[in-house]
Amino acid sequence: MENFQFEDLSPNKVSKVYQDLKKFGSFLYNHKMGVFLVSFSSGVAYLYHNITQSHKRKQIKLAKERVMTYFESTQKLSEREVDAIITKFIDENKILDKIQTPSLASIRSEKDPSEKLKLTDQLKVSIITKLFSVLYIIPMVTIFNRLQINLIGKYCYLDYVLYKDQEQHSMRLINQQTESNFINSRNNCYFFKDINFSQFINLIQEQIKISLKDWKIDQQSSFEGFLKLLINIRNNFEKKEIIASISSDNSLLKYLIPTEEEIDNLVQSQKTPENDNDIEYQNLKMLYNEIRNIFESQKFYDVLKDSINQSFLEFTKNLREDFESTELKKQIDSIVLPDLPIEMEIPKPLVTMHNIILLPKINKQIGNIIVNKKSIIEKIGSTDLINQLNYSVLTNDLDFNKVQF
C-alpha cells in the first residue's frame, strides 16, 4: 500500500476493474441459489457443530455427576462395611484376646521375683501390641476395602454408570461369585482368619519386644517421651521399602492378601461339574495383582501414612489428657490469668507418670478407640488423598472428553 500511486489508475485499468466487478455481479445473480445454498449449508454446519458440542458437554457433565454420585455412595457403603467388619471380629469375636495380657492383680500376688519380672514384661508387651494392632487394623482395613470396592466398580459398574444403559450393565467383566470372593465383608474377611491374624499379631509383638527392652515398668514416662517411643516403633513398620513391599517379611500389608496358592484353593473348593472355575481363578488373580501394584505405588504409600497418622493422632490426643495435671493448671491460672490483658486458655501442664500406672490407662484408651472406631474410619475416608486415589482406581484415570456418548 505504501507504493500505491493515483496515476496507476489509467482509464484502461479502471475500465477493466469495472468489467470484472460487473462479471462478478452477474455471476452472483445467475448463481444466487447456489450461493444461498453454500451459505446456508455453512450456517447449518456451524449450528450443528455448536449443538453437538453443547450436547456432548452436557453429556460429559451428566456422566461426571453420575460417576461422582456412584463414587460417593460406595465410599459411604465402604465406611459402614468396615465398621461392621471390625465390630464383628474385634468386639464380638474378641479376636484381640489372642494377645494374652496378665492382670495387675496376678503380678502383685506373684511371689517369685523371676516370674513377676516375666509377667510385667508380658504386660507391657501385650498392651502395646494391642495398641499397635488396633491403630493399624482400622486404617489398613479401611483403605483395603475401599480399593476392593472401587476395583469391582471399575470392572462391573462403571460402564453402566457412564452410559446409564442396562445393556452395558449386563456386560460385567467379573461375575457375582468372584466379586463375593474378592471383597472383604463381615462374613468373609481373609485378614481376620485365625492363622493369618495370628501371624499379623506375632509380627507386631516380636518387634515391640525389642523396642520395649529398655522401657521398664517401674520407671516414669513423660508424654513427649512416650510419643518418641511410639515413633521409634512405627519406624520399624512404616518405611516404604518395608510396608509397601508385600514380599518383605516385615510388611503388614501382606496379611491382607491371599497367596496365589490360597486363591487356587478357594476357587477349587467352589468347583462344580458345570463350571471348572478357570476364569474365576484368573479374574481373582488379576484383581489381587492390581492390588499388589497399587500397594507399591507412591500414591498408595502417601495415603497409607496419612491414614495411619489419623489413627495414631486420635489415640495421642486422648492420651494427652491422662498426662494433664488439673491441680497444676489451677495454680498456674491463679498466677497468670489475672495479669493477662485478654481472656485465653492456657494448656494444662503435663506431668510424668509411672509406667505401671500408664499401662492400664493405655489399655483403657484402646477400648475407647474400638468404641469410637467409626469416627476414625470417617476421618480417614474424608481425606483428599484417599478419595483421589480411589477415584483414580474406579475411573482408571478416564478422560471424559474421549467417551463416546
Swiss-Prot record:
Membrane topology: Multi-pass membrane protein
Stretches of the chain found on the membrane's Cytoplasmic side: 1-26, 145-405
Transmembrane segments: 27-49, 125-144
Entry keywords, A to Z: Coiled coil, Membrane, Peroxisome, Peroxisome biogenesis, Transmembrane, Transmembrane helix
Ranges of the Peroxisomal topological domain: 50-124
Cellular component terms (Gene Ontology): peroxisomal membrane; peroxisome
Compartments where found: Peroxisome membrane
BP GO terms, sorted: peroxisome organization; protein import into peroxisome membrane
Superkingdom: Eukaryota
MF (Gene Ontology): protein-macromolecule adaptor activity
Described function: Involved in peroxisome biosynthesis.
Entry similarity comment: Belongs to the peroxin-3 family.
This protein's name: Peroxisome biogenesis factor 3
Organism of this sequence: Dictyostelium discoideum
Primary gene name: pex3
